[in-house]
Amino acid sequence: MSKIGPEVGDVRTSRRTFSGNGVTVESYTAMPVVPVVDGGAQMPLQSPALILIHEWWGVTPHIEDIARRYAGEGFIVIAPDLYDGVTTTDAGEAGRLMSELSLEKGLAYLQVVLAELRTWPNVAAIGVTGFCMGGTFALRLACAAKLDAAVPFYGDIPEDTGFIAGLSCPLLFIGGEKDAWITTDKMGRLAAALEQYSQPGEVKIYAGASHAFFNDTRPEVYSPADAADAWQTVIDFMKRKLLPEGA
């Protein structure tokens, strides 16, 4: 089921519902506009797709903006709502929502979206990215399902990193040196696990950057120069990993 939204530049947005295995997931989608119609929405042929996972605030206008930016770069983007329609600007409420979302439930939602994307004949390859809580889920999904690329932004890394042995794709982890939550020690733990399990991954740490430095709606932590560099780095990485050779 889909509800088609307006075109913004060369991007079409919609809100779509995906179901499977007893799970129903509402999602915000954005994709390049081309004259090919499939399932009620316009989609490009043989394009890379991204699952974009939100921060602990929910699917906010900031996440929708990121989805449109990716679509403007040629990606089909699905931003699944792990909070079933709830958003907040209150950190206490966000913390409660995040704590009530189990890893198992979040991954079940994401697996439904991934299964849906795999049925779209126009999808060439699938990557995942996410921020904060979404970065945690992006990392976990890349270790629990077959994907083609993963870029978690400042997601959590637990002490037990054994799950990294299941990493299915090239990984680019992005963090900030001054992040008080996802510390350099945690990121070092991830780098060590990637080496231990001989997994294809890189940890990129921005000097002086804080947690959520990419979020331009939060001036207290936003770092414009680092965000711009991270954006171009991620676009280049995703295109290298998700586009066919010579595309």
Regions picked out by a protein language model, each given a short descriptive name:
Residues 2, 6-9, 14-119, 213-215:
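Serine-hydrolase catalytic machinery in alpha/beta-hydrolase-like enzymes
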Residues 66, 183-194, 202:
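Short alpha-helix in the alpha/beta-hydrolase fold that links the catalytic acid
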Residues 75, 82, 155, 206-208:
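Active-site loop/turn elements of alpha/beta-hydrolase fold enzymes
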Residues 111-168:
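Primarily recognizes the serine-hydrolase "nucleophile elbow" in alpha/beta-hydrolase
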Residues 167, 173-175, 179:
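Short beta-strand/loop motif that positions the catalytic acidic residue
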Residues 178-182, 197:
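Acidic catalytic loop of the alpha/beta-hydrolase fold
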Residues 197-247:
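C-terminal catalytic histidine-bearing segment of alpha/beta-hydrolase fold enzymes
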